[in-house]
């Protein structure tokens, strides 16, 4: 899994500590440390600290706490997928089929994103449908066609604008 160096509070700087980034406060975006702190992480994703590096004395502009450089890797998301998509090692398109069911990951995964199933944990029934409870990672963003499905793309015509009879 991809590893990223970022900053966390001294209290979180412990190997094995897991955390989730819910959103990025506006105050962070103007901070000089943003690009090496929350700017490297994706809101909605969970991370696990795998290495702690020596502190360089940076302080958080919001909490005024000491920030410590750490290496994190994205932790898998646990959620529901239809049984026909729940195969370990397979990359599938998330289509939000479980919307409205408890355990549906639509708060952290967008419709159209490609996800890689890493582990099947069990089964769950919701609205008379069977789902698999799985661990997965998001591997790519949704395609433009899914993001903007209200507009239909049409390829330009290759036919000549007027046909004249051949002589």
Swiss-Prot record:
Covalent S-S links between cysteines: none
Xref: PANTHER family: UPF0179 PROTEIN MJ1627
Family as reported in the entry's similarity comment: Belongs to the UPF0179 family.
Listed name of the protein: UPF0179 protein Pars_2336
Organism: Pyrobaculum arsenaticum (strain DSM 13514 / JCM 11321 / PZ6)
Lineage: Archaea, Thermoproteota, Thermoprotei, Thermoproteales, Thermoproteaceae
